[in-house]
């Protein structure tokens, strides 16, 4: 096995651990996959930099969507990143930025770019169509 394929396999294992620990709400494990915790949510412009900010993001998003979960579709590799296609699902059961819970479910296909330095994630940058989620949460409103 070459060094490149070995690094690729280790990075993929880190991303899988990251995503699975998010599903389990084991955010200490999620934070442990980062060399430096940083989330960039492109559609909203939100940047959560550092362990405290990332943990606050987890708390906010899981208060609004306590059953939030991801379902992996595929992974692609670049020299310094793992690009993940997945479906994010959840039920709006708590307040979110001034919006009261609707009780409605959403499902949205997304892309996350996990940037690496060595074997540690230094940024998760997430891309998705916010209108897809909003339309599902507002359906019938």
What are these regions (language model features)?
Residues 1-141:
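C-terminal and inter-domain tail/linker signature
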């Amino acid at each position: 096995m070459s060094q490149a394929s070995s690094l690729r396999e280790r990075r993929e294992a880190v991303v899988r651990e990251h995503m699975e620990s998010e599903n389990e709400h084991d955010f200490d494990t999620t934070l442990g996959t980062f060399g430096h915790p940083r989330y960039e949510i492109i559609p909203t412009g939100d940047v959560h930099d550092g362990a405290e900010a990332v943990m606050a993001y987890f708390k906010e998003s899981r208060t609004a969507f306590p059953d939030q979960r991801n379902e992996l579709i595929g992974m692609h590799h670049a020299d310094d990143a793992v690009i993940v296609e997945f479906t994010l699902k959840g039920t709006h059961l708590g307040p979110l930025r001034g919006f009261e819970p609707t009780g409605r479910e959403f499902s949205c296909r997304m892309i996350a770019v996990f940037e690496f330095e060595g074997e540690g994630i230094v940024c998760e940058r997430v891309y998705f169509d916010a209108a897809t989620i909003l339309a599902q949460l507002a359906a019938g409103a």
